[in-house]
């Protein structure tokens, strides 16, 4: 049986860990609230942009753009969004597992895909499996700005426009609730299925519609990537908050068990001492 000193040291150590996980839970809750606000503030911009683009693409003018046209797929680009830090439950593992499975199931050679990875966890995951990472981005803020992701947006949209990749997919955790996130692997380019707006507003365009499409479609693709990153950040903070809450609860349970063990050990030690005293007194009679 462990000594009283050893048990007390374990209790003290677990209490220190509990303080850390509780603080991390509170920090993640604050970051989650801000991330949800950022996500909500970005949505009206994307809704209006989608409304205009769907009006043009679904109109009768026949306006087209290369970003709308499907072509034979020889190489697929994947934007994989993970975090720079762990301690977030299954947040990273779930999206990396699904992407890894798709790479193995749909491709026979590394020449058939390019990985654009956001987050240290994702970069380390693929490199440890000898899977080439074409471009990596790490060190993003917990509340990312569009300027921060502009480079990877430029790389991916540019690669599609130049014909270096024939389709582009977004892979990330989408926020469902604080305790639930859903992995999404969705096609970003070509933009073949822009959702039709529910608005019945009719627009008159100046200059011609194809010129407007040429200006707006890259912005729309960039917005989809940035929106996915905002959504993923909400999921990350929610997952970390839930994980730290669970860790704090587990620490409480462990402390209760250790205290019970400590009390039993102390009681056994006292009983042993009394027995020895009584035995010694009896021997003197």
From Swiss-Prot:
Family annotation (InterPro entries): ATP_synth_F1_ATPase_gsu, ATP_synth_F1_gsu, ATP_synth_F1_gsu_CS
GO biological process: proton motive force-driven plasma membrane ATP synthesis
Localization, UniProt: Cell membrane
Keyword line: ATP synthesis, Cell membrane, CF(1), Hydrogen ion transport, Ion transport, Membrane, Transport
Cited Pfam families: ATP-synt
Coarse class of the protein's main subcellular location: membrane
GO CC terms of this entry: plasma membrane; proton-transporting ATP synthase complex
Gene Ontology molecular-function annotations: ATP binding; proton-transporting ATP synthase activity, rotational mechanism
Membrane topology annotation: Peripheral membrane protein
Matching SUPFAM superfamilies: ATP synthase (F1-ATPase), gamma subunit
Oligomeric form and interacting partners: F-type ATPases have 2 components, CF(1) - the catalytic core - and CF(0) - the membrane proton channel. CF(1) has five subunits: alpha(3), beta(3), gamma(1), delta(1), epsilon(1). CF(0) has three main subunits: a, b and c.
Function noted in UniProt: Produces ATP from ADP in the presence of a proton gradient across the membrane. The gamma chain is believed to be important in regulating ATPase activity and the flow of protons through the CF(0) complex.
Membership in a protein family: Belongs to the ATPase gamma chain family.
HAMAP family named in the record: ATP_synth_gamma_bact
Protein name in UniProt: ATP synthase gamma chain
Source organism per UniProt: Exiguobacterium sp. (strain ATCC BAA-1283 / AT1b)
Gene name for this UniProt entry: atpG
